[in-house]
UniProtKB/Swiss-Prot annotation:
The keyword Methyltransferase does not apply. This protein is involved in the repair of mismatches in DNA. It is possible that it carries out the mismatch recognition step. This protein has a weak ATPase activity. The keyword Ribonucleoprotein does not apply. ATP binds at residues 602-609. GO terms for biological process: mismatch repair. NCBIfam families: mutS1, PRK05399.1. One of its GO terms (molecular function) is mismatched DNA binding. Belongs to the DNA mismatch repair MutS family. It comes from Streptococcus thermophilus (strain ATCC BAA-250 / LMG 18311). One of its GO terms (cellular component) is cytosol. This is DNA mismatch repair protein MutS. Transmembrane segments: none annotated. Keywords: ATP-binding, DNA damage, DNA repair, DNA-binding, Nucleotide-binding.
Length: 852
């Protein structure tokens, strides 16, 4: 059989597709974007669109699917959201004037990390990350193409690279070196990233500058090269790459931020129930993004923190002026994203109108800030550049009722361009002339129903019904015949129509040209617009923090150099908001300069984790410049927070709960300094009791003797409380309980000293276990308490070379004397409650109750 001939159009498609094998190719054909071959089959499944075929009668028809060009953005969004790349091939000439195949070229490749336009605009940043490596050092650069933000840094190891990528919530990583297979698996399988290779750099002195290290410059230039290769245009909104160092901010791993619910609730993945949700009273998209950044990266420079506090205090002291400021901020649009649309050549009249409205608000915002008459605001006032000449240009040029498209006309204001006004006058007067002609001919002909209509095919015409055809004047000429009427024209009507159509065509072309010139003028202001955006975002975040401080009765923290923590009647900000102020029980947290470790004991469900998170959250809030929920707060400035809170297997990498515990503990004790905060919750519970206890004791001693970090260590190993006798910088605290008439009430109050009971049986009672089972458990507990566990201090261990924990058991007891074991007991033993959600525990207990 002869080989089927490929049409010139399909050959063009194949030639283009060859250059973009890893992307869906949307091939513009008239009013549709078409996909072919495997792209069509896969896209039809993902997008739920019809799969047809080209050359249906051929032996091997070509699979084909398409989407309308005017609604393509929604389909592109779906593909990109699922982690795919999309290459857009446009027609580069008018098909009516083309000789042969219409010229087509890819004009943009849209990837998860380079989204600019979207049918679902999101205020959050969308960071594209690049990584490079020289020797043992890693370079990392990231950019938000939609806002122009651009940063670069160096990192020590691959785990730090992964943590930073997670913190940035990146979805795509550009790799500038040969990845190890294991590292690639981590990025793809564990972090669910799209990887793109880029070995060439883009040399741009303006954007790279000389403030970066050689490695930072290398990775930043590769990121730039990838962006230019996918976006295929000059991007004037990209900002100069800024050097940053991780140590310039409060260091927290992604796991730590997740366990503290900083930006989203770890259980739901949603904003609600997070610190971000609580603090977000911003009124602008730019402010919202900046607030996320402040929460994600609290400061370690005390002077910078105090600068923020001072402005918040000014806002708190001036309620009415702050209220006016909040109202003005509501009229501010997303300057950064508008500037990027201008840079991409995609800004439409509505975008410029929004920019003009925003610029009109700047003098109002500036006047309000000046009315505070406070030096704390002087820096912000200098940065609030109102750009009056740009606001005047937009206001005078763009009609406030202009359409969103740039081809419909009606964009430019009357009076802005003399020639355009003349064309509009012709069109306006032409309409009046047509009305006069209609009235004149109606009277002259005696056709009372005579009227002039218009359509694109026949232009302007007189509409005459069949019953009036005998009255048609001789100077009328026939244009069209219909079933019940005919259409006529006259020389006079044709002349006016010609003048009007010429004016309309010239007006449309001129209006488009004027708009493009105005947009080009706006582009010259992009740098100043971005500086203005940062200033407004800062004002917005600070007013937001003032509002939350006032609404929730937060206090201004103070900082000390004595390594002292003193939080009087502190609260967990998010838990308090969810529960309500009346229900929440505050707790005082005290570490004097000689106390480094609090060993926290108490029942499960009593509030130990909330107490520890309360401190960590208070530190984050204080160092981002916010006020803190307490009666008073006195803190050192911490350099890092390390946590191990909660227990869950890392199923993707095959690591058990205990392995994850040990890895996170290792990160803490290796990296923490005396200026760090460590939060360990039930460390060691992922292994056998004595293994866990031995490791817990060793870790406590290591932190005490070698690290010196402020540490909260919650444990169910009550035997460890004896360490306070040998470790001078450790104190015991516990969650208070109230026992009365056999009933136990958890008071959620932290008090000095160790807990004397764990009340595990009481928790089981709350869960609804059978009474006879609970009674038997109580008997067994009494027998087990006859055993003794002696905690050896570290000095004794080292000198006698004995294990840290010695266990003396009087004799082996029979746990089930006079007791026939119910099979339910074994199922109960097998429950891994530390790796189950509360709902799963409740369902399991309910199932066990059914079997009793």
């Amino acid at each position: 059989m002869a080989k089927e001939k490929i049409s010139p159009g399909m050959q063009q498609y194949l030639d283009i597709k060859k250059n973009y094998p890893d992307a869906f190719l949307l091939f513009r054909m008239g009013d549709f974007y078409e996909l072919f071959y495997d792209d069509a089959v896969k896209a039809a499944q993902i997008l739920e669109i019809s799969l047809t075929s080209r050359n249906k009668n051929a032996d091997n028809p070509i699979p084909m699917a398409g989407v309308p060009y005017h609604s393509a953005q929604a389909y592109i969004d779906v593909l990109v959201e699922m982690g795919y790349k999309v290459a857009i091939a446009e027609q580069m000439e008018d098909p009516k004037q083309a000789v042969g195949v219409v010229k087509r070229e890819v004009v943009q490749v849209i990837t998860p990390g380079t989204v600019v336009d979207s049918s679902k605009p999101d205020s959050a940043n969308n960071f594209l990350v690049a990584i490079d490596k020289v020797g043992s050092r890693f370079g990392l650069s990231y950019m938000d193409v939609s806002t122009g933000e651009f940063f670069a840094t160096e990192l020590d190891d691959f785990s730090s690279v992964c943590s930073e990528i997670q913190n940035l919530k990146a979805r795509e990583v550009v790799v500038g070196y040969d990845l190890l297979e294991t590292d690639e698996q981590v990025l793809v399988n564990q972090l669910n990233l799209l990887l793109s290779k880029e070995t060439e750099g883009y040399d741009d002195v303006h954007l790279i500058g000389n403030s970066l290290t050689d490695l930072e410059s290398s990775v930043a230039s590769k990121l730039l090269q990838y962006v230019h290769r996918t976006q295929m245009r000059e991007l004037s909104h990209l900002q100069k790459a800024q050097h940053y160092e991780i140590k310039d901010y409060l260091q927290m791993s992604y796991a730590t931020k997740s366990s503290l619910d900083l930006l989203e609730n770890a259980r739901t993945g949603k904003k609600h129930g997070s610190l971000f949700w609580l603090l977000d009273k911003t009124k602008t998209a730019m402010g919202m993004r900046l607030l996320r950044t402040w929460i994600d990266r609290p400061l370690v420079n005390q002077a910078s923190i105090i600068e923020r506090q001072n402005i918040i205090q000014v806002f708190l002291d001036n309620f009415f002026e702050r209220s006016d400021l909040t109202e003005s901020l509501k009229g501010v649009y997303d300057i950064e994203r508008l500037a990027s649309r201008v840079s991409f050549g995609k800004a439409n009249p509505k975008d410029l109108i929004q920019l003009g409205h925003t610029l009109a608000q700047v003098p109002v915002i500036k006047a309000i800030l000046e009315s505070f008459n406070d030096d704390a605001l002087s820096g912000l006032l200098q940065e609030l550049d109102a750009l009056p000449e740009l606001e005047s240009l937009i206001r005078s040029a763009i009609d406030p009722d202009a359409p969103a498209t740039i081809t419909e006309g009606g964009i430019i204001r009357d009076g802005f361009d003399e020639t355009l006004d003349k064309y509009r006058k012709v069109m306006s007067e032409g309409t009046s002339w047509i009305a006069d002609i209609e009235a004149k001919e109606r009277e002259a002909s005696g056709i009372t129903t005579l009227k002039i209509d218009y359509n694109r095919k026949d232009g302007y015409y007189f509409h005459v019904t069949n019953s009036n055809l005998s009255l048609v004047p001789d100077h009328f000429f026939r244009k069209a015949t219909l079933k019940n009427s005919e259409r006529f024209g006259t020389a006079e009507l044709a002349k006016i129509e010609g003048e009007m159509l010429e004016a309309r065509e010239k007006s449309s072309t001129l209006e488009y040209d004027i708009f493009m010139r105005v947009r080009e003028q706006v582009e010259r202001y992009i740098d100043r617009l971005q500086s203005l955006a940062k200033a407004i975002a800062t004002v917005d975040v600070l007013q937001s923090l003032a509002v939350t401080a006032e609404t929730n009765h937060y206090v201004r923290p103070v900082f000390n150099d004595e390594h002292r923590i003193a939080i009087d009647r502190g609260r967990h900000a998010v838990v308090e908001k969810v529960m309500g102020v009346q229900e929440y029980i505050p707790n005082t947290i005290t570490f004097d300069s000689q106390t480094n470790i609090q060993l926290i004991t108490g029942p499960n469900m009593s509030g130990k984790s909330t107490y520890m998170r309360q401190l960590a959250l208070s530190v984050v809030m204080a160092q981002m410049g916010a006020y803190v929920p307490a009666d008073s707060v006195d803190l050192p400035v911490f350099d890092a927070i390390y946590t191990r809170i909660g227990a869950a297997d890392d199923l993707i990498s095959g690591q058990s709960t205990f392995m994850v515990e040990m890895m996170e503990a290792n990160q803490a004790i290796k990296r923490a300094t005396p200026n760090s905060l460590i939060i360990f919750d039930e460390l060691g519970r992922g292994t056998a009791t004595y293994d866990g206890m031995a490791l817990a004791q060793s870790i406590i001693e290591f932190i005490h003797d070698k690290v010196g970090a402020k540490t909260m260590f919650a444990t169910h190993y009550h035997e460890l409380t004896a360490l306070s006798n040998s470790l001078t910088h450790l104190v015991n605290v516990h969650v208070a309980t109230l026992e009365k008439d056999g009933e136990v009430t958890f008071l959620h109050k932290i008090v000095d000293g160790p807990a004397d009971k764990s009340y595990g049986i009481h928790v089981a009672k709350i869960a609804g276990l059978p009474t006879d089972l609970l009674n038997r458990a109580d008997t067994i507990l009494t027998q087990l308490e006859g055993e003794t566990v002696v905690i050896q201090p570290q000095e004794k261990v080292l000198s006698q070379e004995k294990p840290a924990i010695e266990t003396h058991v009087n004799e082996q007891i029979s746990l089930f004397d006079d007791f026939t074991e119910n099979p339910v007991l074994q199922e109960l033993r097998d429950l891994d409650i530390y790796n189950m959600t509360p709902m799963q525990v409740m369902m399991a207990v309910a199932d066990l109750k059914q079997k009793l």
